[in-house]
């Protein structure tokens, strides 16, 4: 695996625009998609048009990104190089690759690894026994590490960040809290505070990799 990774990085194809890759080592639920959208929104706020590249063939993720960052160019294409060309043709000035940490054959200017505090504090085993796609030594490819938490405490996330940062001098490690901020109407777009749910019985449906965390957040 390490030899293949080194070979793929050596042969990596450079994309036609500055490129930021966001991904994780575990199977979903880390918050990489919200982070990718946040980075794209940051670019928009600074007068740049971001292109968000997704590996899929469609589905809900492109819709989510378009809703979160309306001024972004969103392209879903399993061929990221073709996707980058299409994004540039539509006016993109910088590329944000969602779920691209294992995409070693594509070059990037900034490689961001997102680690869930809940996963890092849990099972250490790779698939299929545990949640990990790669061993934690793969964090050596990161230029920045972001430890996210949902129901884990700030102290737990901080401890994970400290542990991951040891021996990786020059690689920043930060923490982020993923929280439900408000309710938003799918059709109306209207917003309501979470307090409207207090004391009420509701049906919660989630199409995310870690639905349990969503249910726990609604209950807090």
Regions found by a protein language model. Give the residues of each.
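Rossmann-fold NAD(P)-dependent oxidoreductase module
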Residues: 38, 42, 98, 217
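Beta-strand-loop-alpha "switch" segments that mediate conformational coupling across diverse proteins
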Residues: 173-184
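Redox- and metal-dependent alpha/beta enzyme cores, enriched for Fe-S-associated oxidoreductases
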Residues: 190, 197-220
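Short, surface-exposed amphipathic charged segments that create phosphate/polyanion-binding patches used
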Residues: 88-91, 185-197
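Walker A (P-loop) phosphate-binding motif
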Residues: 3-57, 151-152
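Phosphate/Mg2+-binding loops and adjacent switch elements
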Residues: 48, 52-168, 175
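Anion (oxyanion) recognition and catalysis
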Residues: 44, 167, 219
